[in-house]
C-alpha cells in the first residue's frame, strides 16, 4: 500500500482487556470513554500530530465492526484507515508481522491503543520524526518502574539495556507505548521467539536495535503527560485530568477533526460538516468555534 507521505502508523487495539472486566466483556477497552471521547481518539490523534495519514487499526475480530462504525475509512479526516485482526494476544511485536503488507517499504510508528499522551514537547518530536534507519522509543519518569519495561543507562546516560518489569529497577524511566521503526522491523519481528508468557515481546525488538547501536531513546519531561489507561484507576485519573484541562485551562486534546484541519488535510467546509454531526453537544460546539475564531 502506497503511503501518503512515506510514514505509516499502527494502533494496536486488540487484547482481552481483562483488567477492566466486566466492562470489557461487552466492548473493547479502547472504545471506553476517557471523559468525552473514546479512548482510541487519543492515540489516533497522537499519530496524526506526527503527520501520519495512513493508519492500520489492529483489533480482535469481535470488536472490529465497532471500530469501523466509529472511525470509518478515515476519509472524513483526510486520512486512510485500514483494519486487521490479531486473533490471539500474541504480543505487541506480532503487529508488525500482521501489518507487513500494510507497511510495505515504509517506516512505521506503533502506538498502544490505551496510551494517552499530551503536551507540546511530544508533538514537536513527532513532527521532526524522519527516521530512515533504526528505532526510536520514548521513556518517561515514573514512581513505579517495576510495572513497565525500563531503560537502564550507564554513568554517561548512554542506554545500557532494557529490562521488562524488573524486580529491582535501576532506572525510573519507563518505556511508553509509542515506538518508531525503520522497515527492518518486519524481518526482526519474524526472528523473535515467544517469551515465557507466550508472546512476541516488543522489548526484545528494542534489544535487537540496541545491539546494532540503532536505538534512540527520547526522554520525555514533565511538560508531557502520559497515561497507560489499562486499569480502572488510570481511566478515572485520565478522565479527570482531561476534564480539568478542557474546562479550566481551555486545552483541548484528542479531537481528530481539529488535528486534520490544522494539518491541512481537510478544509473549513469539511470541518463544519463534521462539527454539525455533533452540534447538539459540547464536542461539536467546540469544533464550530474553531471556524468562528
Language-model segments: residues:
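Conserved N-terminal catalytic core of the sugar/cofactor nucleotidyltransferase
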Residues: 1-11, 19-22, 32-33, 37-112, ...
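Short, amphipathic C-terminal "tail helix"
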Residues: 271-293
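Charged/polar low-complexity intrinsically disordered segments, enriched in acidic residues
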Residues: 257-263
Amino acid at each position: 500500500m502506497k503511503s501518503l507521505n512515506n510514514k505509516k502508523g499502527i494502533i494496536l487495539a486488540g487484547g482481552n482487556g481483562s483488567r477492566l472486566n466486566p466492562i470489557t466483556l461487552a466492548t473493547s477497552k479502547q472504545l471506553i470513554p476517557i471523559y468525552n471521547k473514546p479512548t482510541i481518539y487519543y492515540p489516533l490523534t497522537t499519530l496524526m500530530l506526527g503527520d501520519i495519514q495512513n493508519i492500520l487499526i489492529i483489533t480482535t475480530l469481535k470488536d472490529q465492526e465497532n471500530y469501523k462504525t466509529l472511525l470509518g475509512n478515515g476519509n472524513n479526516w483526510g486520512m486512510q484507515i485500514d483494519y486487521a485482526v490479531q486473533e490471539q494476544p500474541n504480543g505487541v511485536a506480532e503487529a508488525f508481522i500482521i501489518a507487513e503488507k500494510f507497511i510495505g517499504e515504509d517506516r512505521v510508528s506503533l502506538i498502544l491503543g490505551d496510551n494517552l499522551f499530551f503536551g507540546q514537547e511530544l508533538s514537536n518530536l513527532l513532527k521532526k520524526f524522519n527516521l530512515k534507519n533504526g528505532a526510536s522509543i520514548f521513556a518517561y519518569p515514573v514512581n513505579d518502574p517495576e510495572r513497565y519495561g525500563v531503560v537502564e543507562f550507564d554513568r554517561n546516560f548512554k542506554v545500557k539495556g532494557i529490562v521488562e518489569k524488573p524486580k529491582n529497577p535501576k532506572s525510573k524511566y519507563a518505556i511508553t507505548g509509542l515506538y518508531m521503526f525503520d522497515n527492518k522491523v518486519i524481518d526482526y519481528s519474524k526472528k523473535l521467539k515467544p517469551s515465557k508468557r507466550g508472546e512476541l515481546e516488543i522489548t526484545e525488538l528494542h534489544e535487537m536495535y540496541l545491539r546494532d547501536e540503532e536505538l534512540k531513546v527520547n526522554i520525555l519531561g514533565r511538560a508531557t503527560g502520559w497515561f497507560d489507561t489499562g486499569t480502572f484507576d488510570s481511566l478515572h485519573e485520565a478522565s479527570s485530568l482531561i476534564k480539568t484541562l478542557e474546562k479550566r485551562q481551555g486545552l483541548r486534546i484528542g479531537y481528530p477533526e481539529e488535528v486534520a484541519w490544522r494539518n491541512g488535510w481537510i478544509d473549513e467546509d469539511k470541518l463544519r460538516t463534521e462539527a454539525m454531526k455533533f452540534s447538539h453537544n459540547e464536542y461539536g460546539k467546540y469544533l464550530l468555534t474553531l471556524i468562528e475564531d
